[in-house]
Amino acid sequence: MIKVRTPRWINEPVAHHREGKALVVVTGSETDFWNNTFYGFRHQNGHFIAHEVSGDFSVELKFSANYATLYDQAGAMLRVDDNNWLKCGVEFTDGRKQFSVVVTRDDQSDWSVMRLRGKADAPTTLRLTRHAEALRVEIKDGKTWRLVRLAFLGMPETVEAGPMCCSPIGEALQVRFERIAWSDPIDRELHPN
């Protein structure tokens, strides 16, 4: 059974509150997580609800936002330290909603995107799973989970993970996290029949 400790904010946002079981967050101006690659800058001022989690686990998030400005983003993050982390979720680029994954190792970020269908403000469900040194990112497509990324990240036994959101160019992105569910890790099988 996994142990998820009481969370703390890393860069508390302008506003956040509960609406029933949902958590609503409003981002601050020019907030992001990115380390060096291509752009040559380092930003560590995005909003992250950091839960300490030990060992292997899965976390599932269902969320929506009023994405409108380039790079508006919301989703999940797993963090070892400022130089080693992963963030994944929806990012607004090229005028549309994309599924984005950034893996940062040794102070260098990479970035991958996948186009998503549907309205920009439609809810998205993702699952982030830790299997020892591997991180598995999946998105729910109807009733089916689709693998988006399988990545290596050197991690100690205990890491921080949880919801994340940023507005690298704009501000006041309103994100609604409808579901945040922690569980033991899903099966390691990548290609079930």
How does the language model describe each region?
Residues 1-193:
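Extracellular glycan-recognition regions
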